[in-house]
Amino acid sequence: MTAVDVHYVVEGSPDGPPVLLSGSLGSDLRMWAPQVAALTTAGYRVVRYDQRGHGRSPVPPGPYSLADLGADVLALLDRLQIRRAHFVGLSLGGMVGMWVGQYAPHRLHTLTLCCTSAELGPPSGWADRAATVRAEGTGAVAEAAVQRWFTPQWRAAHPERTRDFQDMIASTPAEGYAACCAAIETMDLTARLPKISAPTLVVAGADDPATPPAHAQRIADAVPLARLEIIGPAAHLANVEQPGIVNDLILGHLKENS
């Protein structure tokens, strides 16, 4: 478990309460663009970063574990001299958030878990996807990924943005994507969910084929201070498809627990 210095961007009030945004497999920090203005206008200090192996972050050889990705977060907080943060994670980012909540709870004010899962099998599916990406590049999985990320209606209404997200996935380093698949393949956070002490908001997309609402329900049922919100129409990147609703939910959660 050796941390790397991930690429990050800080926006908003330097003295505001820090909010860390952690993204999905195949994305970079641009996926959180719909949240930045709402959070900074409300006075928060917003930290976005690229997962290791993604965007402009280093790409160490894989496989990676969730503990590796969590160590990157703790190192980033240390680098920015942030003792505790509000953590918002989507998909892989939510898994990282649950790991931090279980193993470093003193670093969290609150936890927001969007479109994620505590256990996402079968492992063979992730191994197969990693093998495809290593052999053919991330472009080979980009089109299928955006079909999971957004509902057909949203893709039809936003063809240019859909292409931008497909290009984002295709530009992800193959080794980084495949190595993060390994982290998901070996992950099972279920048994330790009751150890998460942070007030937790769990958000599910009603139309999410990647992490359906039942996955969010299992998390919300097991985390002591959790509440569940299911929103729609929204697939896997609910923060992009329903930014107004997601922003209101996040801001409400942060204000209730400030």
List PLM regions with ranges:
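Catalytic histidine-centered segment of alpha/beta-hydrolase-like enzymes
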Residues: 234-243, 247
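Flexible "cap/lid" loop of the alpha/beta hydrolase fold
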Residues: 98-103, 107-137, 142
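Conserved acidic catalytic loop of the alpha/beta-hydrolase fold
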Residues: 68-85
